[in-house]
Amino acid sequence: MTNGPGLSRASRFLLYGAAFVILVTGVRMAEPILVPFLLAVMLAVICVTPLRWMQRKRLPTWLSVLLIVLVLLGIGTMAGTLIGTSLIDFTRSLPGYQIRLEREMTELAAWLSGHGFEVSGQLLADSFDPGEILLVVGRIFTGVGDVLGKIVLILIITVFILLEISGFSAKIGAAFPNADRHLASVTEINDNVRRYLALKTLLSLATGVLVAVWLRIIGVDYALLWGLLAFLLNYIPSIGSLIAAIPAVMLAFLQLGPSDGILTALGYLVINTVIGNFIEPKVMGEGMGLSTLVVFLSLIFWGWVLGPVGMLLSVPLTMIMKIVLEASDETRWIAVLLGSRPTEVVVGGLEDEPAEWVGM
């Protein structure tokens, strides 16, 4: 049985698979170019709302774009300065943390010996190296540092996108005969991604501020750095908040002792539980349209393809891919598999007859 002119269903499946492999290989090879471009596109999507607002206030487009760029440049400069100075100070403080660690481990070994467990304090100290904290933080911020190093390129691309965005609809209408369908897809992509990024940014900002305030109250060093880390990694679904908590909790144990370390961990747990499990689902609703499994797999996939930035952008990139797949009868079945509710009607795809996907 065939499903297309001259191609069997299996042949079409193999053809799609080969095209996917070639496309992914090309994207991985083009990662140094694609990452700044994708970040610029996402920045432009976020900045469209303030741009439209300033235009309604009768500000010229060039002045509106200039103000937006100055704000972005200021934020990037402050973030880069905070990261750089904090990591330098952190490195200088490591010997002091090492001394505290050895003292704590000696006391722990004595307590264990009193309860019948003979353990060397030096062995415990060697098994918990504070340098690992710096290593974890350094790896996390490596991708951020690379992005900040390309901030000029990202801002230039963002400027051109914002300047061109007003005439984009007219270009689509002139370029495609079936312009309404393409414009509908572009509008859906823009609305969904902009809503997701705007809400996620606000929730991440709230997470970062609460973490920084809580750590400052407890007395953990570099509270602003850990707040910034919580803000950035909150964009990463599922595991971002957990990764953000690890270095701060380790430092709290090392700097202030077990009780304050537990308080730090509890603070992270409460903040992320309230925001991630209660506030975010109510605010986001069904807006993402992606299943939980797909969100987690997209995190792994885009992280492998585009590195740390791919993990940050995994959800919006998968949302875009799903909307694009929905626009074609040939690929709509893939979009259904990516979705959170398998109740859509699939037309075309691998089957000759339309099939209604019914949840179990």
Language model features with spans:
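Anchoring transmembrane alpha helix of integral membrane proteins
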Residues: M1-T85, I323-M360
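Juxtamembrane membrane-interface segments in integral membrane proteins
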Residues: T2, G6, P50-K57, L63, ...
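Alpha-helical transmembrane segments and their immediate interhelical loop/hinge regions
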Residues: R12, G145-L254, P258-L266
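Generic alpha-helical transmembrane segments of integral inner-membrane proteins
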Residues: G17-I22, G26, L66-A79, L148-L155, ...
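Membrane-spanning helices that line or support transport/gating and their immediate boundary helices
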Residues: M29, I33-F37, T49, W53, ...
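Membrane-water interface of transmembrane alpha-helices in multipass transporters/channels
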Residues: P32-L39, I217-L229, L256-T264, L290-V295, ...
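Short amphipathic alpha-helical coupling elements at transmembrane boundaries
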Residues: R52-R56, D89-R92, G96-R103, E107-A110, ...
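Hydrophobic alpha-helical transmembrane segments of membrane transport and translocation systems
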Residues: G261-M360
